[in-house]
Amino acid sequence: MSKNKDQRTAKTLERTWDTLNHLLFISSCLYKLNLKSVAQITLSILAMIISTSLIIVAIIFIASANHKITSTTTIIQDATNQIKNTTPTYLTQNPQLGISPSNPSDITSLITTILDSTTPGVKSTLQSTTVGTKNTTTTQAQPNKPTTKQRQNKPPSKPNNDFHFEVFNFVPCSICSNNPTCWAICKRIPNKKPGKRTTTKPTKKPTPKTTKKGPKPQTTKSKEAPTTKPTEEPTINTTKTNIITTLLTSNTTRNPELTSQMETFHSTSSEGNPSPSQVSITSEYPSQPSSPPNTPR
């Protein structure tokens, strides 16, 4: 019933909280409008009432939460007190034992007797830890953990027999006179001394050295540039003689004086090569006497 009441009150408080918030928002919006003085006064009064009611609702929320917390703490305290007041279960299960919880030494002695009766030949030391409370004392018996140590392997004991002979590595037969057991054990010394063993060391095979031949340098012969000899210019003697003969044949009929000059010029052409300019001058000016050709010095 109490849970249902708490849920109802919580729901009502939430609803009132929401409605009051909405009313505050509406009143603030209306207050911003330019209304008459009476309306503004009423809105301000409503806002004050709503704000105070919101504060009251918040206080109720906090008080209800604190009440729930205190109720849970009281329940926990009651449970712990009940646990402390109750006696241990392992004492109440067997009423025939007649154990009084005030004597922990009697409890440990009885536990050891029970263990000895159930498992004979086994003795385990128990560590009794007494936990003291206000009215009762409980003992918790913890057996010792078995120590795991590696046992050393002992050599087997030799039987104490009188007729036990130890065979040595080497017994010379010269010691044995008439003892048959000695003759059975002894060893004869060889006359020849064992020669030294010849140890042959393995000869290492010579590794053939491979010499890598380097690439031969390629010698490229530089090709000589072809030397072109200057060609001698052909002599113009033949051309000059042909020109002179044509001029003579053409002008013999016209001027007899010019023929004599050309003959003299032809005779001197063998000694010195006249220039073509001189030939053209003589042909253009036939009346003037031709100058003698310049002889080379």
Swiss-Prot record:
UniProt keyword list: Disulfide bond, Glycoprotein, Host cell membrane, Host membrane, Host-virus interaction, Membrane, Secreted, Transmembrane, Transmembrane helix, Viral attachment to host cell, Viral immunoevasion, Virion, Virus entry into host cell
Gene Ontology biological process terms from the UniProt entry: symbiont entry into host cell; virion attachment to host cell
Low complexity: compositionally biased ranges: 129-150, 233-253
Cytoplasmic side: 1-37
Membrane-spanning parts: 38-66
A single Gene Ontology CC term: virion membrane
Organism: Human respiratory syncytial virus A (strain rsb1734)
Region (Binding to host heparan sulfate): 187-198
Stored Pfam families: Glycoprotein_G (PF00802)
Disulfide cross-links: 173-186, 176-182
Polar residues: bias regions: 254-288
Family: Belongs to the pneumoviruses glycoprotein G family.
Residue ranges, Extracellular side: 67-297
Name of the featured protein: Major surface glycoprotein G
